[in-house]
Amino acid sequence: MFKIKFLRGMPLGLLIPCLLIAFVAISPVIHLTIRSLGADESTWLWFLRWKTLEIVWRSMILAISVTIVCISISVPISFLTNKTDIKFKQLWKISAILPLVIPSYIGAYLFVSVLGPKGILYQILNTLFNINSIPNLYGFTGSLIIISLLSYPYLLLTLNATINNTDNSEEESARILGLGNYNIFRKVTLPQLIPSILSGGLLVSLYTLSDFGAVSLLRYKTLTWAIFNQYSGSIDRNATALLALSLCILAITFVYFESTLRTKRKQYRASPGVAKRHKIHKLGIWQIPAIIFCGAIVFLSLIMPVSMLVFWIIRGLLHNETIPGMLEASINSLSLGVMTAILVIILATPISYLSVRYPRFISMLIEKICYAGFSLPSIAISIALVFIGSRIGSPLYQSMALLVIAC
């Protein structure tokens, strides 16, 4: 039987399905590349202009800034709720994760309703103190604040999983050598959290790059905004493909950058092997500032938008307002979520088994391709699958199956 040397005993019955899955994952990039290469000279001249570079720069700066802010929020909350005696610890630990369930578009709309130029805060200040204007929430600043408040739980989840498994013996050794709590955190605890910060930061940056709802509502021009406008306002689909491909390249660049940083850094042991109880740090006089910090983040990211949403619901019910199609939309959303979860489990299981059981070059390549597929912004995948689906036609085009594949 003919055997390819680099396969080295890998079962073809497992390898072939994994190759097909990897091909499907990377097919949007392949299609966008082919479509972009088919663009004429005028389309390329339109694309290779200063305005495009400016939009790419704005997207990149927003993603980096949001990641930095999320790190500044998540690291203190994770440390406070896992390694200190902060009051209401479980309350902060649970409530700090919940902003993850608020979609960015809805969250941005709620924030604008409260903090916008004509929002509730303005109306209160105008009535009580005759203040005629408040700082503008639109643009980069508003996008940075709102996306950071809604996406920091991605990083917080990875940090919580790691900080509970850090090697406590190193902290004890540092304490015996005379280091204080601050130096122990900076020299011992924080280096053990760096891999989680990098991976969580990557999730946040990819989420920011792919976000369309918040930036469109806040009028901040990013690549997702440009792609949507080009797709809806022009018949030149090659120009849309060029913008979508540039967004994919930017996302893959972030993935490569994170992988490079992770490889170059020293690796620290995160688990001591034998479970040891972590030392709980006494906050003392810092108890109140810690509670204020956690409370402020939870209030801004969860309580304020949810309260505004509940207020609207109650006001609508009091005025006998109805939402047509609410039940059907809810069923469709639930069905889509369940089907997508089942499909993800089915597709991820053979790839995980292949990469762990047969750690070869080909299995690692398949795994990286699937990671790259995950890193692609949703609007770029949507554009590519619309192109592919329109070529295939019925029954795939505009079907639930195509939507599940995209998700």
Q: Residue locations for each model-derived region?
A:
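Cytosolic juxtamembrane amphipathic/interface segments immediately preceding
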Residues: 1-10, 178, 275-283
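Feature of multi-pass inner-membrane transport and sensor proteins
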Residues: 45, 125, 167, 183, ...
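Helix-turn-helix DNA-binding elements, focusing on the entry/boundary residues of the two helices
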Residues: 170, 237
